[in-house]
Structure formats: C-alpha cells, structure tokens
A protein has these predicted regions:
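Iron-sulfur (Fe-S) cluster-binding modules
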Residues: 1-61, 71-72, 76-84, 107-259
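Short glycine-/small-residue-rich Rossmann-like dinucleotide-binding loops
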Residues: 64-66, 90
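Active-site neighborhood of phospho(di)ester-bond hydrolases with catalytic His/Asp-centered motifs
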Residues: 86-88
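Short gly/pro/ser/thr-enriched loop/turn and capping motifs at secondary-structure boundaries
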Residues: 91-96
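Short secondary-structure transition/capping segments
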Residues: 98-100, 152
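Short, hinge-like loop/turn segments at secondary-structure boundaries
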Residues: 102-106
Length: 259
C-alpha cells in the first residue's frame, strides 16, 4: 500500500490597517520562502494569491492594527480559527503610524482628509492586535526583518520558541563598528531604547535611530530623555521623536506624554 503524504500545516496571512510592507517582506524572502512553501500549505495569503483554503489554520501571521468596528470583530474570528497567531510589524504590535490619532481627535483628522467624513466608520484609536486577542509571538519592525521572519516560521515548523534578539540597536551599532552618533555628533537617537532588528541602518548613515522596531524590553526612556535634554532637544522635539511608527507602544507613549 502506498504511504500517505504527511499533511502539511496550514499557514494564513491576514491584513488589517497597514501598508502591506510586512507582507512584502515575506514575499521578498524568495529562496527561503520557496523552501518553507514546500513544508506548509499557504492557505490564505491574498497579497500573493487569490486562492483561499478554509480554516482552521495552524499558524496565522497578522499584519496591521485595529481601526474599525468590523476589524475588531474580524480579528476574533481569525484568532478562533488559528492554533498559533503571530503579529508582524509595528502596526500589528503597537498600532502603527496611524496610532497618532490616539493623541488627538479623530474627527478632526477625518474632516481634513476626507471630503465626506460622515461616511467613514472608524474607531477613535488605532490599537495593537494584542489588545483584542491572545498573541503567541510578536515580530516587530517597520517593516519586519525578513531573516527574523524566516526564523519564526522555522521555529514553528520545528516546534520550538523563536530565537529573536531582545538587544537594542546600540548592540547592532557596536557589531558593525558604527561610531555612536549621539556621543560623537550630538545627534538625537532612540537606539538605546529601541529593539534590534534593523541592522542599525540609520546610525550607519549618520542619522539617529527613530525607533521603527519599537521599544526594547525594559527600555529606560526616562534616562534617554534626560540625555536628549542635555543635547539641547526641546520638549516638543522629544515628543515628536517618540511619536512615530510605535507611538502607542509602552514606554514610548508614556514618555512622549511627559515631554
């Protein structure tokens, strides 16, 4: 009798409020994606294919934040249909750049952007997926690091915990031999409080880190803010520094409120 082919785990990729950049990072994996594709069944990935296989799903990758009542309901359905759920990118893990609405009045923004704002159904805030459902792992970045994404997928296939660095961008600067832009040039930089993963691209080109990978674990933002003050950075400038792609992530949110 012919042996049965082992059933491949189902992978689903979901989009909420986002720019699709993190999904494109998955497609950009190229050779690595081809190897992984042979070990999983890509059941739902509208960025790559219109073909959809019904759940339940073994692993769901979720990009984007929750900004509408409909999406708040939809994410609960995705969670119910998924054995494991991993959020990918700043939008899904912290609310994204669109979370700047959380610090103002959303109706004022709508009146500026849309000719008929009364037709727009939206929530007053943009929130991370973890504020609505249980998340098994968060992969940060804007966009995500594709090597880290491959590590997460490989870890899932092997039944182990992903090995993703929890260090700061400062460590990445040291590893690539980049001179500290804040110490040497007095350039404001969020590197000491930002999660590693970008490869310290901005400091390598003499620009301060602007926190696209979000706050690292136990980030000492209060200490950094004091140093920024020494450098002559105003309260308004400090607030703008913390309020970018991960404005709604703690402790960036709290520290920006103190500025």
């Amino acid at each position: 009798m012919r042996a049965r082919t082992p059933k491949r785990p189902k992978l689903a990729v979901w989009k909420f409020a986002s720019c699709d950049g993190c999904q494109l990072s998955l497609l950009d994996c190229e050779d690595e994606l081809l190897a992984i594709a042979g070990k999983v069944e890509i059941a739902n990935f509208l960025e790559a294919s219109r073909a959809v296989v019904k759940g339940p799903y073994d692993l769901s990758l979720v990009e984007g934040s929750i900004t509408t009542p409909h999406d708040a309901q939809r994410i609960t359905q995705v969670r119910k249909a998924s054995k494991f759920l991993v959020t990918i990118g700043a939008c899904a893990t912290a609310g994204g750049i669109q979370a700047l609405r959380n610090f103002g009045h959303v109706r004022e923004f709508l009146s500026v952007v849309y000719a008929k704002p009364e037709y727009i159904e939206t929530l007053a805030t943009s929130t991370a997926i973890a504020e609505h459902v249980k998340v098994d792992f968060e992969l940060r970045g804007c966009p995500i690091n594709k090597q880290q994404l491959v590590e997460v997928l490989s870890a899932f296939l092997k039944g182990r915990k992903p090995n993703v660095s929890s260090a700061s961008v400062c460590i990445e600067c040291k590893r690539r031999g980049t001179v500290c832009v804040m110490v040497a040039q007095g350039i404001p930089c969020l590197g000491p409080v930002t999660h590693a993963g970008c490869g310290a691209i901005c400091p390598a080109y003499h620009r301060g880190c602007y926190g696209c990978f979000g706050p690292k674990e136990a980030a000492n933002t209060a200490s950094l803010s004091r140093q920024l003050t020494v450098l002559g950075v105003s309260e308004e400038q400090r607030q703008r520094l913390y309020r970018t792609f991960n404005a709604n992530a703690e402790p960036f949110r709290t520290e920006s409120a103190h500025a």
